[in-house]
From Swiss-Prot:
Residues annotated to bind GTP: 30-37, 57-61, 75-78, 142-145, 173-175
Positions annotated to bind Mg(2+): 37, 59
Organism the protein comes from: Geotalea daltonii (strain DSM 22248 / JCM 15807 / FRC-32) (Geobacter daltonii)
GO molecular function: GTP binding; metal ion binding
Gene3D superfamilies recorded: P-loop containing nucleotide triphosphate hydrolases (3.40.50.300)
SUPFAM superfamilies referenced in this protein's UniProt entry, alphabetically: P-loop containing nucleoside triphosphate hydrolases (SSF52540)
Record protein name field: Probable GTP-binding protein EngB
Domain EngB-type G: 22-194
Record keyword Magnesium present: yes
């Protein structure tokens, strides 16, 4: 996917504040500190399009970004951070289900997991929601440079078994060495309308 430009559109907490659903959307979901911001920044070849919060999980906002005027990238709020107030945790479920259930232009969700961690209840809940609403999940396993080849194989089997999927459905990624970047773009292009998806490739450097 050749990235010509990426622009922030707006943040929202409820459907009434979402931007118009004129373009197909690809959303990114995952627990706090899973590497979601780094994944998005690498994919669009920007250093700080999405910034990592100093208080992970505390800001419960859905952030929308225009990509090339062709589709919308949606950064969903992280979940599972232990220090988040209970009231904030309770907001996450209804906010996510409302977005997934009512956003008709949502074409796929990148569900992000850390290679070193076993999926948590919220990861499984998110996958079940996607399956219930017939939304294509793209499973991305981050921080793969932090484990050995043998450990990657072992953890992949644990993650797949916990989620109830095949290991072949897992897409491996490293923000450090860019492993998996082109493959993930191909997975995204598979769920975008044909007229939107371009050929996978290196995005131009940001100016």
């Amino acid at each position: 996917m050749l990235i010509k430009y990426v622009e922030f559109i707006k943040s929202a907490t409820r459907a009434a504040h979402y931007p118009p659903g004129d373009l197909p959307e690809i959303a990114f979901a995952g627990r706090s500190n899973v590497g979601k911001s780094s994944l998005i920044n690498v994919l669009v070849n920007r250093k700080s399009l999405v910034r990592t919060s100093s208080t992970p999980g505390r800001t419960q906002l859905i952030n929308f970004f225009d990509v090339n005027g062709q589709f919308t990238l949606v950064d969903l709020p992280g979940y599972g951070f232990a220090k988040v107030p209970l009231a904030v945790k309770k907001q996450w479920g209804p906010m996510m289900e409302n977005y997934l259930a009512k956003r008709a232009n949502l074409r796929g969700v990148i569900l992000i997991l850390d290679i070193r961690r076993t999926p948590v209840a919220e990861d499984i809940q998110m996958l079940h929601w996607l399956q219930a609403y017939s939304i294509k999940p793209i499973l991305v396993i981050t921080k793969c440079d932090k484990v050995s080849k043998n450990e990657r194989g072992k953890q992949s089997r644990i993650i797949a078994q916990t989620l109830g999927v095949e290991t072949e459905e897992l897409n491996f990624f490293s923000a450090l060495n860019r492993e998996g970047k082109d493959l993930i773009w191909r997975r995204i292009e598979e769920v975008l309308p044909a007229e939107t998806a371009g050929s996978a490739g290196e995005a131009p450097k940001a100016t």
